[in-house]
Regions:
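Active-site environment of non-heme Fe oxygenases that use a 2-His-1-carboxylate facial triad
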Residues: 1-29, 42, 97-103, 112-316
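TRNA-binding/sensing appendages of the translation machinery
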Residues: 34-53
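Conserved short loop/turn motifs at secondary-structure junctions
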Residues: 51-55, 170-173
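Glycine-rich nucleotide phosphate-binding loop and flanking beta-alpha elements
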Residues: 55, 109, 299
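Generic hydrophobic/packing signal
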Residues: 67-71, 107, 121-125
Length: 316
């Protein structure tokens, strides 16, 4: 198997050409692919298996299971709309095709997060639809010292989850239950602050680091999705519309502040997004491709698209 690399800014994607048809995979071939993938992940943080020829969810599940690590079988507490397809395999998102999904580290707002993300393209879109990636160390290094310090002090992710009718996801959908005791146990174990609202909704605040140490390199890396949780991230004028429909920012489905409660300024958000654009790498999907992402090292997103796109994901 041969590999090549592609680089944008400080982000490098390793492309491993498997050069094997879907019906020619055997255990020896998979062992070779897994070994090469681990080596490349250690070097670059993201690897694309090109030509893997994965045809369906069943084959993807079998392939991912062989990489080791227990598959995460529940997305409880997650804010992204997605569907479960089989044990440990989900749609990557149900977010509308006409919108981009900005760069982020998966579940960085949670107490626990996946180490690795495995994406597989079962149907490639007509246009767009790539899963862009961005090196977290490069992103952090592109920010001014003062901004790095503010994120290093931490961020607070705030949610208002309605009880069945309202903006955004309900707490029932978010936590996959209508049992308040189950929700309270989950949030308590997560170290989150929470309170039930008089209208049946739920307020949640999670204090998390904005920067973490990357054990692979020993250096600090960006690890948050604060800009994604800010209403200015919403497409078109939806952020302003949401603000006009609520009495307070605390009633927004998502809201984020620095650790001391200070809101993120427009200038800070602009600086973060400019750095993301500088280091964002885009590689179009081909049917059967598999992309493996070290979640602590590399951010990912989704480009808007046309046509039919089916990209599934597993997490370990």
């Amino acid at each position: 198997m041969r590999h090549e690399t592609r680089t944008t800014g400080g982000t490098t994607l390793a492309i491993l050409h498997t050069e094997t048809s879907a019906d020619a995979w055997d255990e020896a071939r998979w062992q070779e692919a897994r070994g090469r993938t681990r080596e490349l992940l250690d070097s670059y943080g993201v690897v694309l298996l090109r030509g893997a020829g994965i045809p369906d969810v069943t084959a993807f599940h079998a392939a991912v299971s062989g990489f080791g690590g227990a598959l995460i079988e529940s997305y409880r507490g997650g804010n992204t709309p997605r569907k479960t397809l089989s044990d440990g395999v989900f749609t990557s998102t149900e977010y509308p095709a006409r919108y981009d999904i900005t760069l982020h580290n998966e579940l960085s707002y949670a107490r626990g997060w996946p180490d690795r993300l495995y994406f597989c393209c079962l149907d490639a879109p007509d246009t767009g639809g790539a899963t862009p990636v961005c090196d977290g160390e490069a992103l952090l290094g592109a920010l001014s010292p003062g901004l790095r310090e503010r994120f290093a002090a931490g961020v607070v992710y705030r949610q208002y989850l309605h009880g069945g009718a309202g903006l955004g996801k309900s707490w029932q959908d978010t936590f996959e239950t209508d049992d308040r005791a189950v929700v309270e146990e989950f949030l308590t174990e997560s170290g989150a602050d929470f309170a039930w609202a008089a209208d049946g909704g739920l307020r949640v605040a999670q204090h998390r680091p904005g920067v973490r140490k990357n054990p692979r390199t020993g250096r600090d890396t960006w690890f948050n999705q604060a800009d994604q949780w800010h209403p200015s991230n919403l497409p078109d004028d939806e952020g302003e519309l949401l603000l006009s429909l609520t009495d307070s920012v605390d009633d927004l489905p998502h809201w984020v502040t620095y650790a001391d409660g200070t809101p993120l300024s427009d200038e800070d958000l602009a600086e973060v997004r400019a750095a993301q654009r500088e280091h964002k790498l885009i590689e179009s999907w081909q049917r059967g491709d598999v992309m493996i992402v070290d979640n602590l090292s590399v951010l990912h997103g989704r480009e808007a698209f046309t046509g039919t796109r089916k990209v599934v994901v597993s997490m370990t």
